[in-house]
A protein has these predicted regions:
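Hydrophobic alpha-helical transmembrane segments
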Residues: 13-18, 61, 101-106, 159, ...
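Juxtamembrane transmembrane-helix termini
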Residues: 38, 42, 123-126, 186
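Juxtamembrane helix-loop-helix connectors linking adjacent transmembrane helices
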Residues: 46-53, 88-168
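Aromatic-enriched alpha-helical transmembrane segments of multi-pass intramembrane proteins
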Residues: 63-73, 146-157, 192-194
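Hydrophobic side chains within alpha-helical segments
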Residues: 66, 70, 119-120, 176-177, ...
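Transmembrane helix-loop-helix hairpins at the membrane interface
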Residues: 114, 151-202
Length: 202
């Protein structure tokens, strides 16, 4: 951990931002292209097609795939450039113990209450009316998408839904922010607490 990286942390940070931008663009294009080709709809009708109940399974897998491209690939690419073993650099290992499992459960449970409190605080912060209207519109669209994706008719749907719309995207997001961005920021600032704080804010 104390060894000097092959690629400077400042360069890794720039690469990560660049790859993230490219990943977000490619994931959006990939989602639109796959939807248009597989569901036989024009590009302009892709959002409506993804919201239809009969296309919910496709939407789930497409969401997981695009999240993988947008979040996981950039972090993996930077780690691959910076070291020989990308997965080890990202923090993946085969060792796990019961303390880690319990810690994850406790943190996740606590985060539920914290997110609710932060949401309430966010509501009382004064914001421009046009910004609030735009933010609420985006939130409503997101909630509608989540409701569509979360439609589950049986236990198989439940398990598949949890894997595709919850577990997989959460893992890919954590790889980007914790294993990718946080690792680089800690190395860049040479301060673990500061690097973790900055990545948490972002």
């Amino acid at each position: 951990m104390n060894q000097k990286p092959v690629v400077a942390y400042s360069s890794q940070f720039a690469l990560l931002l660049g790859f993230l931008g490219v990943g977000l663009i490619l994931s959006g294009l990939l989602m639109s292209w796959l939807t248009a080709v597989l569901l036989h709809v024009p590009f302009l009708q892709v959002p409506e097609a993804l919201m239809k109940p009969e296309n919910v399974q496709f939407s789930r897998f497409a969401n997981a795939l695009t999240t993988f491209v947008a979040f996981f690939i950039p972090a993996w690419a930077v780690a691959k450039i910076a070291s020989k073993n990308a997965f080890q650099t990202l923090g993946f290992n085969s060792h796990i113990n019961i303390k880690q499992v319990i810690a994850v459960g406790v943190i996740s449970f606590g985060a539920l209450f914290l997110s609710g409190s932060l949401s309430a605080i966010n509501e009382i912060i004064p914001m421009p009316a046009n910004f609030l209207a735009k933010a609420r519109k985006m939130e409503n669209e997101y909630q509608q998408t989540m409701i569509t994706l979360a439609t589950m008719k049986n236990m198989g749907d439940l398990l598949l839904g949890l894997l595709v719309i919850a577990v997989a995207p959460a893992i890919f997001e954590e790889v980007l922010f914790r294993a990718g961005l946080q690792r680089v920021l800690v190395g860049l600032t040479k301060n673990a607490a500061l690097g973790i704080m900055i990545s948490s804010i972002l």
